[in-house]
From Swiss-Prot:
One Pfam match: Pep_deformylase
Entry's EC annotation: 3.5.1.88
UniProt catalytic activity: N-terminal N-formyl-L-methionyl-[peptide] + H2O = N-terminal L-methionyl-[peptide] + formate
Keyword Metal-binding (UniProt): yes
Signal peptide as annotated in the record: none
Cofactor remark from the record: Binds 1 Fe(2+) ion.
Name under which the protein is recorded: Peptide deformylase
Keyword annotations: Hydrolase, Iron, Metal-binding, Protein biosynthesis
Recorded family membership: Belongs to the polypeptide deformylase family.
GO molecular function: metal ion binding; peptide deformylase activity
Single GO biological process annotation from the record: co-translational protein modification
InterPro entries referenced in this protein's UniProt entry, alphabetically: Peptide_deformylase, Peptide_deformylase_sf
Length: 187
């Protein structure tokens, strides 16, 4: 579950990758599976981690940096140097828990917008690590939520698509200069 990629946890003056924001078509595409885990993928994962830390995030999906690949990086405790980040390549949720929980989410691709989203509290996920080895983890709480949020990005879904409170959604998007028409409601 730990990552073998060494990255300093901290803000860089110039993050290596550029974030894309709500309204950008790249965020609405279904990302492509990664056929081979190689140095190019490991470099992308490292740069994604550096970008995530520089942006003060706890998760980042490749489409958020304009890369159409099924790769996510996560660190739910970025202030703790002992907590290793996760790199999940071709992640797939195999099982959802029965208990649903509302929790406030935000997104590096929609800065300043924070709204409640209801998601399963527990999941089981299969993926490949940065060496290409198959892995499977059970996650609950914050880790479960971040994995689900980032996998949504890989499928062209953004957290605002899942927000049920339309009044709060419209208000926050407008305050931050985002268009409500960029939201694609999940039925």
């Amino acid at each position: 579950m730990t990552v073998g990629i060494s990255v300093e946890k901290g803000k860089q003056d110039t993050p290596p990758l550029e974030l894309h924001y709500l309204g950008d078509k790249v965020l609405r595409q279904k990302a492509k599976r990664i056929a081979k885990v190689d140095d190019e993928i490991r470099t992308l994962a490292k740069e994604m981690l550096q970008t995530m830390y520089s942006s003060q995030g706890i998760g980042l999906a490749a489409p958020q940096v304009g890369v159409n690949k099924r790769l996510i990086v996560i660190d739910t405790d970025p202030e703790n140097p002992a907590n290793a980040p996760l790199v999940l390549i071709n992640p797939e949720i195999k099982k959802f828990g029965q208990q649903l929980c509302p929790f406030e989410e935000g997104c590096l691709s929609i800065p300043g917008v924070h709204l409640d989203v209801i998601r399963p509290d527990e999941i089981e996920v299969s993926y490949r690590d940065e060496q290409g080895k198959p892995k499977r983890i059970k996650a609950s709480g914050l880790l479960s939520r971040v994995i689900q949020h980032e996998i949504d990005h890989l499928d062209g879904v953004m957290f605002v698509d899942r927000v049920e409170n339309e009044i709060a959604l419209s208000s926050q998007l407008k305050q931050r200069g985002f268009a409500l028409k960029s939201v694609q409601r999940i039925a």
